[in-house]
Design a protein with these regions (language model features):
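Small-molecule-sensing regulatory modules
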Residues: 1-38, 43-44, 49-51, 122, ...
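Short, Asp-centered acidic motifs that coordinate Mg2+ and/or phosphate
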Residues: 71-75, 154-155
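Short, well-ordered beta-strand segments
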Residues: 5-7, 74, 92, 115, ...
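Short beta-strand and adjacent tight-turn residues that come in two discontinuous sequence segments
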Residues: 58, 76, 157-159
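Short, structured active-site "lid" loops
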Residues: 47-73
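Short glycine-rich anion-binding loops that position phosphate/pyrophosphate groups of nucleotides
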Residues: 78-81, 161-163
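A conserved helix-loop-strand patch within extracytoplasmic ligand-binding domains
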Residues: 78-79, 85-135
């Protein structure tokens, strides 16, 4: 196959991620085109994700297009993937990861009101800033920063990966990069995942050629841990891995509990099970 149709969300960040995948495939002689799909999460941009609830808010409609063979691959922010992909679909590749950290972007030195629409971020912010008021915040990166600039919030929490990929200038603000100890990232944060049909042999071979093995070494443990936690957007859950050579450190957040564990990469499944037992 020398041409692929990509199913994707239509945000500026999503389209930039499509470009990254397309550029990688092009080096292997594959051309692409994008079909934009509006997901349930896109259609409701008012309510907090934790209030909409459910699993795969930004994924399921795209997976349907893939399953119906109207597209060859789907490009996602891996943090949006539910722990259970649709039957018959697999993650065929991941692209080189961007930074996985969350950023606290600050307008006012005296932080009284912090904006986020994520249950995970809200839970962690309440630990870090117990006196602050947490207010809901939705929208794309530009919308969220505009609301911050307009004075609706003193600070907001945003993923560094999106800022980096879009080249957004944060110089008007003070920026605090949060460590995994301060805020456990979402599973797959900073990773672009490419989904395809399990029976699409040729597509899977072409994706294997562009897969980033180093990122996959982080992606697989995070996905395994996330699957053990079995959570959705309505729950404060984080699953993060830091790989250093043959060593791995795993971080987990589940509701009001968090913990970490380190060991050999080859033992990541056992480490994940131990960590999940600690926090659940």
């Amino acid at each position: 196959m020398n041409h692929m149709v990509i199913a994707s969300r239509g945000s500026r960040l999503s389209l930039r991620q499509d470009e990254i995948v397309s550029e990688s495939l092009k080096k292997n002689g594959v051309t692409t085109e994008v079909t934009v799909i509006r997901t349930r999460g896109d259609l409701d941009s008012t309510h907090a994700l934790k209030d909409i609830g459910g699993s795969g808010l930004f994924i399921r409609e795209i997976e349907q297009v893939l399953a119906d063979r109207e597209a060859d691959i789907a490009v996602h922010s891996a943090k949006d993937l539910p722990y259970d992909l649709r039957e018959g679909l697999v993650t065929g590749a991941v692209m080189p990861a961007a930074d996985s950290a969350d950023l606290l972007v600050i307008r006012n030195r005296e932080i009284r009101v912090i904006g986020t629409g994520s249950a995970r971020r809200e839970a962690e912010i309440r630990r870090l800033y117990p006196e602050a008021e947490i207010r809901g915040l939705r929208g794309n990166i530009e919308t969220r920063l505009r609301k911050l600039e307009d004075g609706a919030y003193d600070a907001i929490v945003i993923a560094e990966a999106g800022i980096d990929r879009l080249g957004v200038d944060l110089s008007p603000f003070q920026v605090k990069k949060l460590t995994p100890e301060e805020m456990v990232p979402a599973c797959g944060q900073g990773i672009i995942a490419v989904e395809c049909r399990a029976d699409a042999t040729e597509v899977r071979e072409q994706l294997k050629a562009v897969n980033d093995e180093e990122t996959m070494r982080r992606f697989l443990p995070e996905r395994y841990l996330f699957g053990l936690l079995r959570a959705d957007c309505s729950m404060p859950v984080g699953a993060h891995a830091v790989v250093d050579g043959d060593r791995i450190t795993l971080y987990a957040l589940y509701m009001d509990k968090k913990s970490r564990i380190s060991g050999s990469c080859s033992d990541y499944r056992e480490l994940c099970r131990t960590l999940a037992d600690r926090v659940m």
